[in-house]
C-alpha cells in the first residue's frame, strides 16, 4: 500500500524524530529500513513507512501509517520489534515518537 495522506483515510500516523550524530545518520536510516522490510511490513495494521534524513545530518524521521492506534500499540509489545528498537537505539542519541491524525491536506492537483 502506498502512503496516502487524507483527512478521510482511517488510521493513525506515527511521526518519530530521531536525533543522531551526523556520521551515524546513514547507519540509522539503514537500520530503520531493514527493520521495516524484515518485520513491520508483515504486521497486522501496518500500512506504510517513509524514512527521511535531514540535510544537516542530525535527524532522521520515520513517517509511518497504521490502521489503528490499537494495531500500533500491539506492535510495540512484540519481541521482534523490541529487538529492532534496541538496535536502533544503539545508533540514535534520542527519539520522539508521537501518533497523529491528519487534519488538513493541500496539494497542487487538488486545489479548491
Where does each model-flagged region fall?
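Residues that cap or initiate secondary-structure elements
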Residues: 22-24, 70, 103
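An amphipathic, aromatic/His-enriched active-site/gating alpha helix that lines ligand/cofactor pockets
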Residues: 34-47, 65-99
Amino acid at each position: 500500500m502506498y502512503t496516502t495522506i487524507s483527512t478521510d483515510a482511517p488510521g493513525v500516523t506515527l511521526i518519530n524524530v530521531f536525533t543522531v550524530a551526523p556520521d551515524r545518520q546513514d547507519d540509522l536510516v539503514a537500520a530503520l529500513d531493514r527493520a521495516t522490510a524484515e518485520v513491520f511490513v508483515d504486521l497486522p495494521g501496518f500500512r506504510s513507512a517513509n524514512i527521511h534524513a535531514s540535510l544537516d545530518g542530525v535527524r532522521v524521521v520515520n513517517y509511518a501509517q497504521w490502521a489503528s492506534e490499537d494495531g500500533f500499540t500491539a506492535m510495540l509489545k512484540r519481541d521482534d520489534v523490541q529487538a529492532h528498537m534496541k538496535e536502533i537505539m544503539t545508533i540514535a542519541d534520542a527519539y520522539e515518537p508521537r501518533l497523529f491524525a491528519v487534519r488538513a491536506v493541500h496539494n497542487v492537483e487538488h486545489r479548491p
